[in-house]
Amino acid sequence: LLTIFSCTTSTDVPLPITTASEEALEMYNKAWYYWGDHDAIKQSEYMKKALDIDPDFILANLYVVENDPNKRKQFRDKAIQNKNDGSNAEKLLVDMFVAGREGRTNDQINFAKKLVEEYPNSSKAYVDLGDAYNVTRNFSSAAQNYIKATDINPENVNAWWRLGSQHINVYTNQILLPASKQDKKLGIKYIDKMISLRPEAAVGYQIRGNVDRANGDFESAKKWYTDALEKRRATGRAASGLLGVIAHNLVFNGEFDSAQEYYNLGISEGQTANNKYSVGIFQIQSYLFNDDYSGAIKVADQISNDLETYGFSPVQIYQNKAQIELRKFLAHAHNQKKEEAYESLMMRKNYSERAMELMEVDEVRQRDFDANNAQYQAWYHILFGEYNEAETQLNTLYSIVSKIQSPTALDHYSAMMGMVRLFQGDSEGSLSYFNENIDTENYQYYSYFKALALQASGQNTIAKDIFNKIANYNFNGLGVSLVRSLAKKQLESQ
């Protein structure tokens, strides 16, 4: 094995990388370049080329994008197995991954601090420490480390992206600063730096479009997305995700039929099974924004039927069918169709169980499986007014997630307890559960009910502000798709 140390004249000293092959290292570095363009397909392609040459390549096993859970676990297990054969940097990076997966966020931060202490001239080390802080919502510490990374290497496009992503919505499940602390001008400054570093890459133009979409300037967003699509086409990169983004913009601009054409195009152009499925999930949710529950269920059934033609493995088919049934359950439940909602809830659980049967189940997978079952069962009971049953499930959820170190581990439990107390007529008790983590940037669904509790307790100004943010939230997510129209109705009734 060779441990490659930097011979660069740059002030940015790459972390030492252990591999048996210079060619494998070249493929690995190409993968990271494409990751800077947010091209998961190319990242995966070149990481796997590196692994074809050197199957024991620690960091390639750790970072390769792989959507099949069994294959992904094989890669990560190989990284864990080999961590002591590499440099201390590689060991720390693997330890960070394990800690993050297990929810040991304090340990994750401490490992990252050691990485920075041992490799103070590596911009990547500071990005990794920033990421560890960001997960815990310690945004200022995260930003300080991202900025330090750009001080070391002004061309570290991943660091600029991290800085911009604190202020600008781009991806589902992205962690953003609370709306009151966001600075869109600063975010644009960071994204413009990305564009200057990678003018041929589509991602910067897409993010600029997202800024305009967030502000309700859908026509300006269209221009940015057109530029981004041209970049994708010119470089022969996958465009299905961007076609979905164009569709989102059309949904919020009231051009629903045109949006469906773009969703369909995104599915048909998907180069991977996951590309097709991801666009399909967004298409289901687009109907929920319009309270078209039957339309959402019709599309969900079609996508579920098509999954086997996408090229998924059996375990992925079951996992994805479970996610589709979750959306059907919520569509039925918000339409107050109890029998149908329960059927979809049980189908979701059944598909998840079948997926588990095809996986090597460790403690974390079992924990997450049990937590999801309790959470979704509680959700069902809440939406149909069965509050004692809901509390029983939430107590089960608490017994699972309270053992996780993460400061966000209790968020779903707390928010759902807040919903229970609200519907029981105890607005003050409800607000004691709706903590500061429940904000409109990261939990739009729960924020709607938090606003109802605030309104019931006489805090109308704060409640109205939350309703307004949700009603004008122009991004496609499951939770917000269920409450955006409800927030609009609250504003109209005042």
Per-region residue spans from a language model:
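Alpha-helical adaptor scaffolds
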Residues: L93, F97-R101, S165-N169, S402-T440
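Alpha-solenoid helical repeat scaffolds
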Residues: Y28, L59-Y63, K91-V94, K124-D128, ...
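TPR-repeat structural position
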Residues: A40-I41, T105, F139, N173, ...
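Solenoid-like repeat scaffolds
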Residues: K48-I53, I80-G86, K113-P120, D151-I152, ...
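Alpha-helical segment of the N-proximal tetratricopeptide repeat
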Residues: A20-K49, I53, K91-K114, E118-K124, ...
